[in-house]
Amino acid sequence: MICPVIELAQQLIKRPSLSPSDAGCQEIMIQRLAAIGFTIEPMNFGDTLNFWAWRGEGETLAFAGHTDVVPTGDESHWHSPPFEPTIRDGMLYGRGAADMKGSLAAMIVAAERFVAAHPDHKGRLAFMITSDEEAKAINGTVKVVEALMARHERLDYCLVGEPSSTDRVGDIVKNGRRGSITANLRIHGVQGHVAYPHLADNPVHRAMPALNELVATQWDEGNAFFPATSMQIANLQAGTGSNNVIPGEFYVQFNFRFSTELTDSLIKQRVAALLDRHQLDYTLEWVLSGQPFLTAKGALVDAVVNAVKHYTEITPQLLTTGGTSDGRFIALMGAQVVELGPVNATIHKVNECVSAADLQLLSRMYQKIMEQLIA
């Protein structure tokens, strides 16, 4: 008999839910949750499907995740078709197996087992699911959180099923994430002929000292939970493509991954002061993708660590490394937020896969977390 976690994961992987498409994944989950007494509230925005589901009342533990996946790349490089889930040598292959349809299956089956064992559980169990995490992430969790906050919805704990693990399930737990802010800088000059530089003003030449200082700056030293803030230049663009034209404008895009030692407003102030010191003629636009968040300690961290230790006998590392996740939006509700999911070695890659045994373990861990917090 096939494991219910693996069976559900396969059903979800079969759905080609390229972001922001859901391709029917949420309907599968909704039917399973409704069957065990959950109230389902669709919260769709634009081209994105979301739902908020809950059972019980009181102190609230939510499980959050996304049904959308990234593109497959060249399918001829896959050992088996990416939307035909295949088990080989104990590994479940398919796009989304690790990020994050395996986690979704583990959550649903954990909820079914938990409700069967604790039909009158004392707290509230909830699900916050979106199809817009991998792409723009503008009509997904952020909009759901805004709607829930507007009506003063309670959220005490949130477990995000992102693939947090490195070598074995549960070895890494994310108890926070760095903030992310991007600068789109345009430095203005005067276009001209390269043979007559005195009649032009080359913005690339003007910008170089400022960019050198930008790169050399140590923005902070981090703290006990976060590494030092990182600034990386991502894109540069200037010129017409001709070798005899001095460009009239120089575009530079750079990104900060910042710790709780900095704020987005402080970053903006320091960058503007640096550019002004170099007397540049510029325009600057900022895009804030997310604030840093941290759950340093608390009942959720304790429950997650205990669940991992119970099933693996390893003590997970609590880290804040990696990119952003939807946890950055959920933390705005004042909830304790922790990420626990499968091994992330193959996410977004050709031949994405996850250990079938790990998914079974993960589901038991999720159930154990439920039992500790709201049984």
Swiss-Prot record:
Pathway: Amino-acid biosynthesis; L-lysine biosynthesis via DAP pathway; LL-2,6-diaminopimelate from (S)-tetrahydrodipicolinate (succinylase route): step 3/3
One Pfam family linked to the record: M20_dimer
Cofactor(s) listed: Zn(2+); Co(2+)
Disulfide bonds: none
Matching SUPFAM superfamilies: Bacterial exopeptidase dimerisation domain (SSF55031), Zn-dependent exopeptidases (SSF53187)
Binding-site residues for Zn(2+) 2, renumbered to this chain: D99, E134, H348
Residue sites binding Zn(2+) 1 per the record: H66, D99, E162
EC top class named in words: hydrolase
Gene Ontology biological-process annotations: diaminopimelate biosynthetic process; L-arginine biosynthetic process; lysine biosynthetic process via diaminopimelate
EC numbers, comma separated: 3.5.1.18
Single GO MF descriptor: cobalt ion binding
Reactions the enzyme catalyzes: N-succinyl-(2S,6S)-2,6-diaminopimelate + H2O = (2S,6S)-2,6-diaminopimelate + succinate
Keywords noted in UniProt: Amino-acid biosynthesis, Cobalt, Diaminopimelate biosynthesis, Hydrolase, Lysine biosynthesis, Metal-binding, Zinc
Active site residues of this protein: D68, E133
Cofactor: how and how many bound: Binds 2 Zn(2+) or Co(2+) ions per subunit.
Functional summary from the UniProt entry: Catalyzes the hydrolysis of N-succinyl-L,L-diaminopimelic acid (SDAP), forming succinate and LL-2,6-diaminopimelate (DAP), an intermediate involved in the bacterial biosynthesis of lysine and meso-diaminopimelic acid, an essential component of bacterial cell walls.
HAMAP family membership: DapE
Family of this protein: Belongs to the peptidase M20A family. DapE subfamily.
Subunit structure: Homodimer.
This protein's name: Succinyl-diaminopimelate desuccinylase
Species per Swiss-Prot/TrEMBL record: Yersinia pseudotuberculosis serotype O:1b (strain IP 31758)
